[in-house]
């Protein structure tokens, strides 16, 4: 069904509660008129394990958290003068990543590409009414990279979309999509060729993220 479900838990020592999240991503759902992401969060008492609350957010909090993580990366790692962004993907994360980026960078133009040109055009049409910047659909991922100072990839792709030969001086890439072992948006050679590779968790990305594919290809240790 081209989908996945993930269960994650979090606890900070000393807090009176801990949380468990169940999140799903079923990437053919838009064809059925349904959102691709869904889920809920459960809050429990740290001392007793008793249920305190159920947050039926349907994946919204996960989407917001992911978008904010991308914006934080761009804020601290991209050129502060960047005014153009390229987005690979045309789903909910594409929208939320763009909205979050606008909080930290003075973006004037966004270039959008996805494998489904119809979906790309629909995305561009819908978001133009909500965001007061230029939104332009691109014909290829290479064109998107060439026009961009910041590039955000947010797809469930299992094969590389962005090639290493497209890299250019000053380009910042926020790669959001590869959150499972089989997912891969970037040519593994990019990890070797870039000036800096900064993962949120190296131990995690060496197994599940883009770093995993570069290690398997023998490009990095």
Functional labels for PLM-detected ranges:
Residues 1-62, 69-71, 78-81:
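N-terminal ligand-binding/catalytic initiation module
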Residues 77-84, 106, 168-169:
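Short helix-loop-beta connector
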Residues 90-91:
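Glycine-rich Rossmann-fold phosphate-binding loop(s) that bind the pyrophosphate
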Residues 94-95:
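N-terminal Rossmann-fold NAD(P) dinucleotide-binding loop
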Residues 103-130:
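NAD(P)-binding Rossmann-fold cofactor-contacting core
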Residues 131-148, 164-165:
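Short acidic low-complexity segments
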Residues 147-150, 157-172, 188:
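Rossmann-fold NAD(P) dinucleotide-binding segment
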Residues 167-169, 176-221:
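Rossmann-fold NAD(P)-binding glycine/threonine-rich loop
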């Amino acid at each position: 069904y081209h989908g996945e479900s993930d269960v994650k838990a979090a606890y900070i020592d000393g807090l009176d509660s801990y949380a468990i999240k169940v999140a799903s991503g079923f990437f053919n759902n838009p064809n059925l008129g349904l959102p691709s992401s869904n889920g809920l969060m459960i809050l429990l008492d740290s001392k007793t394990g008793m249920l305190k609350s159920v947050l039926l957010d349907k994946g919204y909090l996960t989407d917001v958290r992911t978008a904010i993580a991308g914006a934080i990366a761009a804020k601290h790692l991209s050129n502060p003068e960047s005014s153009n962004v390229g987005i690979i993907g045309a789903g909910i994360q594409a929208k939320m990543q763009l909205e979050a980026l606008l909080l930290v960078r003075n973006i004037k133009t966004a270039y959008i590409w996805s494998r489904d040109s119809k979906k790309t055009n629909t995305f561009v049409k819908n978001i133009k009414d909500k965001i007061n910047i230029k939104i332009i659909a691109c014909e290829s991922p290479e064109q998107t990279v060439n026009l961009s100072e910041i590039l955000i990839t947010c797809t469930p792709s299992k094969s590389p979309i962005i090639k290493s030969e497209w890299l250019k001086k000053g380009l910042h890439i926020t790669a959001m999509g590869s959150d499972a072992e089989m997912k891969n948006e970037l040519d593994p050679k990019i990890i070797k060729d870039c000036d800096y590779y900064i993962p949120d968790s190296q131990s995690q990305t060496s197994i599940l993220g883009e770093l995993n594919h570069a290690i398997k290809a023998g490009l990095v240790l």
